[in-house]
């Protein structure tokens, strides 16, 4: 139950608001007049019919909450932390002291303890940290700039591709907007047709109503005219049938429009497919780009291989020079031996012959060395020719760049032409919109004419029977004219169907051309894949040739080393011969003969080695010739591929020109057809005007219906023509976009090298400037750091004492914050226990009151306090008396009650205290955080 239903009169004034409910105040006040400002006056002004007023407590001026006074139950928290009482004076009563309370620590807080200054001391450490960060940042910058120089070139190329893609997306969005505009125009035309149909239905209803009125009036006038009216009604029924046929035709036209909308959707799907094909072509073009880059890399590798061959040839030249020097040294030694032999006259002629043989062999060796030198010179000439061929290829590439630029200009011209055509088409659409507005005006005029017809219809009732007969004759004539017009209309429909059939045939032809182009593209892709395979095979062959060549070079080096060893052995033997000649002049002839035989054998071995080397050189020549042939074949294949690509591009351009010519011819034919239609329309309009002059009210309405149907046909035709022109423009745009994309990519690939070189030069200049500026800034920072190092050395002595002060102040603040938190939790617990006790008491009272109202006897074990049974409000044996004038008691919870100033003041005071406590708490937390950071930084571990 609600609280207001149980309280007696004036009991709410004795309650105090709490977050849970109302609390009874003390019953110490009297019902006297207000004597002091703290006494609460009687708000009822002594109503006689109201119940007795409850005694109220005289409140003190400072009605703040004291946790020790309000709550009686003990706290459930741990008393490990002492309580802090800041502004509580010591109580004079020694008997009422709470022994559970701990000593007050505010006096300890007020002691003059030397506190640290964390902000000032932290600046030094922050500066040191900045110094270390600066050193690391320099290293990272130096490494990062090196990577950035390599990465920016790739990023610039990617940005170019991204910009092209964005431009293409923008063009596609514009085309979609144009498409939506045409669809909106189509919707407006459909709405206009619906309006015309509604008007036709309204006219038919008016005709029916007027015919009924005429029939009702003529029955009163004449009975003989009924037959004539029936005849007129039959004729009107026939006319209605004709109207139904016209409506059926209109429905057929609507169905045709639906079919056309489906065709539009199918064509949109085709557009999406074409866009997907464009994306595939783009991906194929990118693959071709990668292939070209791969070929360029192979050319670079081969140039590097040629350079390596040059280096190896230079090494061979050095080895040959060393051999020549050795041969010269051997000649000098032989000359010395000859002089010695001349001095010794006892030497025989056989030894002289041996010496001549040795000289001849040495001369042969020199000739072989000269031949090898000539071969090396020839190889160098071949290398120079290869380098010249490479330069020629580079010049051809530059020529291709210029050709691509000219083709780009041609494409720009074609783009301009297409844009002009698009503008013309837009102007035509504007003119057609103007025609639509003219038609709307004509429809309004027809509405006015209908209003006039309504007026004239009332006058037509007085027409005589003779005029009705003449009208019948005119109706027959008009029926014949309608038949003629229907025949013409059927002929026009046949012509339209034939043209639609021709248009479908042209569309099928265009689709066949598209398929052929796609097949050519697939063939080109297959050829490119074949060329890739050939290039890979050639690369593997060249790799094997390199390995064989290196093996042969290693074998030659080994042979040369063996030759050197043999030469050294011969030198040792010559020295031994000298010694033997000095020792034994008698045995010289025998030993020399043996030595000469050995030398002959050695010379034969050397000649065999030379022959082997010559064979190896010839094999190397054949390998080099093969390599040249393969290289020339690759060049010829590349030239053929490029020639084929150029031919394909020319064929595509010719096809574009042919398609443009076809479009022009189609446009001209469409214009001629439109003019013929206009002429026919004018002739028909003249015939209709002639018939309209002869007809009267009923025939006028039929004529209007026919005119409206014709206008609908014209609108449908215009709509169809607009859709056809739109689709043709879309096809042209797609073709031009594909050609543009190809040529742009080719141009960008060829211009990348020049742009990259310029970008790298600009970057190098910027890097130099940045390095100079960084060097100057580093010098200045070094000076500042040296000065600060001197200051830091002076401050190191004071750090130890400051660390102790920081630790002491940190733990002291932490301790006091925990103590305050514990005291706050105790207060909250006591308050909640008190609120629970009051709530349980209130529930018990409510149950007792319910039992009293229902006359339920008390149980034997009554748990309520005796105070509640003795009160004059809540006793069991005292009936609850309601006031007589209940309407005057407007101080319950259901009535608006005015707040007293005291409650507002207490609320404001509580808010101010909470604000102060929050401020102090925030400042203590900030101070704790600063001290913790300082302690961690001083201990050597930093956690960020």
Swiss-Prot record:
S-S pairs: none
Gene3D superfamilies hit by this protein: 1.10.287.1490, 6.10.310.10
Xref: InterPro entries: Spc110_C
Residue spans crossing the bilayer: none
Modified residues (Phosphothreonine): 18, 64, 68
Biased composition (Basic and acidic residues): 96-110
Location in the cell: Nucleus; Cytoplasm, Cytoskeleton, Microtubule organizing center, Spindle pole body
Coiled-coil positions: 119-799
Main subcellular localisation: nucleus
Highest taxon in the source lineage: Eukaryota
Record region (Disordered): 23-110
Polar residues bias: start-end ranges: 28-46, 67-78
Segments for region (Calmodulin-binding): 900-927
Keywords annotated in UniProt: Coiled coil, Cytoplasm, Cytoskeleton, Nucleus, Phosphoprotein
Pfam families: Spc110_C
Residues where Phosphoserine is found: 60, 80, 529
Similarity field: Belongs to the SPC110 family.
Assembly notes: Homodimer. Component of the SPC110 complex containing at least CMD1, SPC29 and SCP110. Interacts with SPC97 and SPC98.
Name this polypeptide is given: Spindle pole body component 110
């Amino acid at each position: 139950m609600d609280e207001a239903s149980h309280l007696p009169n004036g009991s709410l004034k004795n309650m105090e608001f709490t977050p849970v409910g109302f609390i009874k105040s003390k019953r110490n006040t009297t019902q006297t007049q207000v004597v002091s400002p703290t006494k609460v006056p009687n708000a009822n002004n002594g109503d006689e019919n109201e119940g007795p007023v409850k005694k109220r407590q005289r409140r003190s001026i400072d009605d703040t909450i004291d946790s020790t006074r309000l709550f009686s139950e003990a706290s459930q928290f741990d008393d490990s932390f002492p309580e802090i009482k800041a502004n509580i004076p010591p109580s004079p009563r020694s008997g009422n002291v709470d022994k559970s309370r701990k000593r007050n620590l505010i006096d300890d807080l007020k002691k003059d303890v030397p506190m640290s200054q964390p902000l000032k001391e932290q600046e030094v450490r922050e500066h040191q940290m900045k110094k270390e960060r600066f050193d690391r940042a320099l290293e990272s910058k130096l490494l990062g700039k090196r990577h950035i120089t390599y990465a920016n070139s790739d990023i610039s190329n990617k940005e170019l591709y991204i910009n092209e893609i964005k431009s293409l997306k923008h063009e596609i969005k514009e085309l979609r907007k144009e498409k939506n505009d045409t669809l909106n125009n189509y919707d407006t035309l459909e709405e206009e047709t619906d309006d015309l149909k509604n008007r036709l239905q309204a006219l038919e209803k008016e005709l029916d109503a007027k015919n009924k009125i005429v029939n009702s009036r003529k029955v009163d006038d004449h009975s003989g005219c009924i037959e004539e009216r029936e005849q007129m009604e039959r004729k009107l029924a026939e006319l209605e049938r004709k109207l139904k046929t016209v409506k059926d035709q209109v429905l057929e036209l609507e169905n045709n429009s639906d079919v056309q909308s489906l065709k539009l959707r199918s064509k949109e799907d085709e557009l999406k497919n074409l866009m997907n094909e464009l994306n595939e072509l783009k991906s194929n073009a990118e693959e071709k780009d990668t292939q070209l880059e791969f070929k360029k890399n192979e050319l670079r590798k081969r140039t590097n291989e040629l350079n390596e061959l040059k280096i190896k040839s230079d090494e061979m030249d050095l080895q040959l020079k060393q051999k020549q020097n050795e041969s010269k040294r051997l000649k000098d030694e032989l000359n010395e031996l000859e002089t010695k032999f001349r001095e010794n006259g006892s030497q025989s002629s056989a030894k002289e012959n041996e010496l001549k043989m040795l000289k001849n062999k040495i001369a042969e060796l020199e000739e072989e060395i000269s031949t090898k030198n000539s071969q090396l010179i020839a190889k160098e000439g071949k290398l120079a020719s290869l380098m010249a061929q490479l330069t020629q290829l580079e010049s051809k590439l530059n020529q291709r760049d210029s050709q691509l630029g000219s083709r780009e200009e041609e494409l720009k011209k074609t783009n301009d032409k297409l844009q002009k055509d698009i503008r013309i088409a837009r102007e035509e659409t504007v003119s057609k919109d103007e025609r639509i507005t003219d038609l709307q005006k004509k429809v309004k005029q027809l509405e006015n004419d209908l209003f006039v017809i309504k007026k004239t219809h009332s006058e037509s009732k007085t027409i005589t029977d003779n005029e009705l007969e003449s009208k019948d004759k005119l109706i027959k004539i008009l029926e014949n004219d309608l038949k003629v017009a229907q025949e013409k209309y059927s002929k026009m429909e046949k012509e339209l169907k034939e043209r639609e059939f021709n248009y479908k045939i042209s569309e099928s032809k265009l689709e066949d051309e598209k398929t052929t182009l796609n097949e050519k593209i697939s063939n080109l892709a297959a050829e490119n894949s074949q060329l890739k395979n050939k290039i890979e095979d050639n690369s593997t062959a060249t790799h094997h040739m390199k390995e064989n060549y290196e093996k042969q070079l290693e074998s030659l080096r080994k042979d040369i080393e063996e030759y050197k060893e043999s030469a050294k052995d011969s030198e040792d033997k010559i020295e031994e011969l000298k010694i033997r000649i000095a020792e034994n002049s008698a045995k010289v002839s025998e030993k020399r003969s043996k030595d000469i035989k050995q030398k002959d054998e050695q010379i034969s071995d050397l000649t065999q080695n030379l022959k082997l080397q010559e064979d190896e050189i010839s094999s190397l020549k054949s390998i080099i010739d093969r390599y040249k042939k393969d290289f020339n074949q690759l060049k010829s294949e590349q030239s053929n591929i490029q020639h084929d690509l150029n031919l394909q591009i020319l064929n595509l351009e010719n096809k574009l020109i042919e398609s443009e010519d076809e479009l022009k011819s189609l446009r001209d034919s469409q214009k001629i057809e439109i003019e013929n239609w206009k002429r026919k329309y004018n002739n028909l309009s003249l015939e209709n005007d002639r018939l309209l002059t002869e007809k009267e009210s009923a025939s006028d309405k039929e004529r209007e219906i026919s005119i409206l149907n014709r206008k609908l046909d014209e609108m449908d035709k215009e709509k169809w023509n607009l859709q056809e022109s739109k689709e043709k423009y879309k096809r042209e745009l797609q073709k031009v976009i594909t050609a543009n994309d190809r040529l742009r990519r080719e141009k960008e690939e060829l211009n990348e090298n020049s742009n990259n070189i310029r970008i790298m030069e600009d970057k190098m200049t910027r890097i130099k400037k940045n390095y100079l500026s960084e060097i100057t800034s580093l010098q200045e920072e070094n000076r500042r750091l040296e000065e600060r190092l001197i200051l830091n050395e002076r401050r190191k002595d004071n750090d130890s004492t400051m660390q102790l002060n920081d630790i002491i102040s940190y733990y002291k603040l932490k301790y006091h914050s925990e103590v305050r938190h514990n005291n706050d939790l105790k207060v909250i617990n006591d308050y909640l226990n008190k609120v629970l006790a009051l709530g349980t008491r209130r529930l018990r009272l409510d149950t007792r009151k319910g039992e009293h109202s229902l006359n339920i006897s008390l149980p034997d074990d009554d748990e309520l306090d005796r105070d509640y049974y003795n009160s004059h409000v809540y006793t069991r044996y005292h009936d609850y008396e309601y006031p007589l004038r209940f309407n005057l008691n407007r101080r319950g919870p259901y009535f608006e009650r005015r707040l007293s100033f005291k409650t507002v003041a207490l609320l404001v005071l509580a808010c101010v205290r909470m604000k102060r406590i929050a401020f102090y708490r925030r400042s203590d937390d900030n101070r704790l955080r600063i001290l913790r950071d300082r302690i961690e930084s001083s201990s050597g571990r930093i956690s960020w």
